[in-house]
Amino acid sequence: MIVAIKRAKRFSPNSEDKDARILNSLCDLLRQSGFDIRIVDEDDFCLQKDAEAYISMARSDKALVELDASKVPVINTVRSVFEYCQNREFQTVHLAACGFNVPEPKGKDGYWVKKAYGYSECEDDVVFAPDEEACKAAKAAMSERGVKPYVCAHVKGDLVKFYGVSDTPFFRFYYPDDDGEMKFSNNGHNGVPKHTPFDEYDFMYEANAVAKSLDLDFYGGDCIIRDDGERVYIDVNDWPSYSRCYKEAAEYMAIKVIKAVHHGNIDLLRERIENGYYEAVIFDYGGTLDSDGMHWGKRIWHAYQKNGVPVDEPLFRDAYVHAERTLAKNPIIQGNDDFTETLRKKLTIELDYIQERVEGFYPDEWLDDILDTLIEATEESTNLSNEVMRELFGDYVKKGKTILVSNFYGNVNAVLSQFGLDDSFSQVIESAVVGVRKPDPEIWRMGLRAIGVSDPSKALVIGDSYDKDIIPAHEIGCDTLWFMGEGWTPVIPDGAKANWVMTSWFDVYEP
């Protein structure tokens, strides 16, 4: 059973419904995955004997002290809430010590006087002061209420609200001053955003690093993008409402919870890999080595979103399925087609399908931009995979113990070559070549036979598809490592057939 702890109303000023919505969305997904869920109020919470994990929005000292005695996983951790998110001054000092940009104590553009410890429960807990005299008055007023004030300088630039789930691809950011959606009315002091250009990928990785330094799994915050493109972190919070992106966020949050429940002893896995325990390590390709565990349908959809393609997700999904079926039935992909050419052909089929159904839609306006986005993302993923193959599995590669097993079009070797992965595998078992497709367990047996391994228990299978990789490999007796990422459907398997679960290569690989 997983116990979900609701946030008390006093900790959800103007956000009570939104906080309830994200918790309920997450719980619904976990129920669909087969978990028993019990929801309790934080003011009534006590430890449950049969709990496998706690997912907690709690912020009260009473609930957090109780949770601190838990022997099962707690998301977010008590430490992240108690030490880092409830103490604004300590959080700022900690982030600065970790090398992240934070507001200075003094400045010439005004000040923010904030409740130093605990959470903002009303507008009087966060006050803008245009000058030092107003700052002194705001501090005095806060002190009179029995609240210790914390002061930092106002930072000019674009205000950005960001949301993430640590060590997953989920990261979103928004400009609240574009639409005026703010928790308190005093948040509009940065004015109309300029949308100053900055590196969005770098923001994603840096925000994830910020969250990890605070021990947060579910996180959000406020950041200022200065005119020079530098980012300054104003506040980082535990478990925000994810109001603009709660459906997507809930999917990744569910992945994180399932991983916590079925994580397995990851130290044992590292030890086995490093000590040469396995006679074979078998990798899936698509989704595992080239997209960080994310289903390729989702990766393409996110590229459509990033480029502003005027199509809704249901139509995109139809186009994606149509393209997959078309490529499966017709010899469109040739054996020497590399990744770029393969993807160009796939996208062309998708976009032509959309054009037939959307008036005024022209594929040529979108093809190159989508393709460039996907190539950039794939290069980033495969660069890390190359590093993992070289550093973590290097001895296995040298001894010819690494195998690729993939459902592909007959050109996987050309694709591997484009990304420098062609020397990583002694054998490649490709469905279009051998005539067997996943989830048939036989394709995994073919991989074992290819290098003369007779004992499946001495093989490790790594794949992103629970149904096509993990279950059949488990059935024949292999150890399995499930690379759990954003799936094609919101229903997430419970992971019980996986020996280990990861949401990032960094779960098993330490550079």
What does each model-identified segment do?
Residues A4-R7, S12, S70-K71, V78-L159, ...:
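Active-site nucleotide/adenylate-binding loops and adjacent lid/helix of ATP-dependent enzymes
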Residues I273-E391, A414:
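N-terminal helical cap/lid subdomain that shapes the substrate entry/recognition surface
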